[in-house]
Amino acid sequence: MKVYKDVFTNDEVCSDSYNQEDPFGIADFREIAFEVKSNKRIKGNDDYGIADNSEEAVDGMGADVEQVIDIVDSFQLTSTSLSKKEYSVYIKNYMQKILKYLEEKKPDRVDVFKTKAQPLIKHILTNFDDFEFYMGESLDMDAGLTYSYYKGEEVTPRFVYISDGLYEEKF
């Protein structure tokens, strides 16, 4: 299994157990980012509805049981709110930081990053109100944010990651 970690904080933010797709359904963004679909799961109770053979075990849940988004729970992501102006300042600094990282560690990615990053960020800014932002476990604003949004009528969010801000670790 591969776990994806932030290059600046080593926060675990995703794994290869999730199918990676084109961000926002736009194939051109795939060179710089990827998107995964989340699921809800029940956390807390040991029974999980097995005793009553219920497909929707939520009905009989006790007070100590809650529904969680699997990616948020598994990787200890924390929702954070940013104004559009705050995000603009953050992303400008983050993109400069990623560019410097790529120049030092992955010079072959610099041109791709320079070409593809701007349209991706423009898409995020254009649809800013559709996003929820998540931070990794360290809660360090130097790290990359994870972008969450709902696609169509789906009941769980999709999460988008900037690939060049992550590295893979095999387990």
Swiss-Prot record:
Which molecular-function annotation in GO is an example for this chain? calcium ion binding
On whether Signal is a keyword of this UniProt record, the answer is no
Give the top-rank taxon of the lineage listed in the UniProt record for this protein.
Eukaryota
Query: What does the UniProt entry say about where the protein is found?
Result: Cytoplasm
Kindly give the PROSITE patterns that the UniProt entry links to this protein. TCTP_3
Q: Name one Pfam family in it.
A: TCTP
Broad class of the protein's primary localization: cytoplasm
**UniProt keyword annotations, A-Z:** Calcium, Cytoplasm
**Listed GO cellular component terms?**
cytoplasm
- Entry-linked InterPro entries: Mss4-like_sf, Mss4/transl-control_tumour, TCTP, Translational_control_tumour_p
Q: Does the keyword Calcium apply?
A: yes
Where is the TCTP domain positioned along the sequence? 1-171
What is the protein's known function? Involved in calcium binding and microtubule stabilization.
Family membership, please give it.
Answer: Belongs to the TCTP family.
PANTHER family reported for this sequence: TRANSLATIONALLY CONTROLLED TUMOR PROTEIN-RELATED (PTHR11991), TRANSLATIONALLY-CONTROLLED TUMOR PROTEIN (PTHR11991:SF0)
Could you identify this protein by its name? Translationally-controlled tumor protein homolog
Q: Which organism is it from?
A: Plasmodium knowlesi
Gene label? TCTP
